[in-house]
């Protein structure tokens, strides 16, 4: 992985997050977990490059995010192999499966000790800045509540500073 300036990124975020998806990973070489996310944002806030990540509290990765200052967002591309990894990491819990063993992902330690993956075409290392909890009362467009009916609880929202970016 080659470290790059985050301001050099020129990905179309609608394609990158909305269609390609990403792995959200928290922890360190001794204890980490990753999950697939297809909701998120990249932008500029508080004079910092930021990402916004949405994680349900019941997810195994959520607890590890809570215990750590940093997380990574890893983008594997749109290949058939990447899609298999995304599908597995999005449907199986790290409580029950060794996702590295099951997917063949190769963990790589970042400068801050976070975990990225050798297969990633792009990894954003991020530091938590802000967290909020989504609740039904906060929705201005109540039609959006349809996303939550039978699907489980509301997401927590993390605003994270992009501290490092790595490209393959």
Could you tell me what each predicted segment is?
Residues 1-37, 41-168:
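Active-site-proximal mixed secondary-structure blocks
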